[in-house]
Amino acid sequence: MVVRGAPAIGVAAAWGVVLAARAGDDLDQAIEGLRASRPTAVNLSWALNRMQSCDAAIAPIDVGQLERLAAAIESDDRVLTQALVNHGVGLLPKDCRVLHHCHTGAIATAGVGTALGVIVAAHQQGVLKHAWVDETRPRLQGAALSAWELGCCGVPSTVIVDGASGLLMRRGE
C-alpha cells in the first residue's frame, strides 16, 4: 500500500482525478481504475463519487472546478479529524492508559489523525499516562506506523503483540 488510511486514500483519489483531468485522460475510466485499487475503502468510493458528480455536472471538463472540489475534500478531512480529536480528548479521564490497534494517525489522514490523534492530543494536554500499541499483524501498521508517530510526538508508548491486548484489558491496564 502506497497510500494507507481511509481518509488519506479518499483525498489521494480526489487528487488522482484532478491529475487524470489535467492529462486529458478519460475521467470515467480513471475513476473506475482508482475505485478498483482498493474497493473496500469507504472514503475512496465516497470521494470518487463526489468527483464523478462534479465531472458529470460540467461539460466540457473544468479542471479548475475539479481542483476546487479535491481541495475541499482535503480541507473537510482536516476539519473533521480536528473536531474528532477535540471531542475524543474530552472523553478520556485523567491519567488514562489506552490500547490502540492498527494505525489512525496523521499520515493516514489529511489532518491530525483520528484515534491516534486523540492519543497525541491527550498526551499534549497531560491526560494520557501511557499508550499500548498492538503490532497489528500481518502488515504491522501499529509497530511500524503508530509507534513511530507516537515516538515523534513524545508520547509514552509500548508496542505489544496482538495477542497481549486481552491480557492488558483483563488486568485493567
Spans of features found by a protein language model:
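Acidic, glycine-rich active-site loops and adjacent beta-strand->loop/helix elements
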Residues: 15, 34, 104-106, 135-140, ...
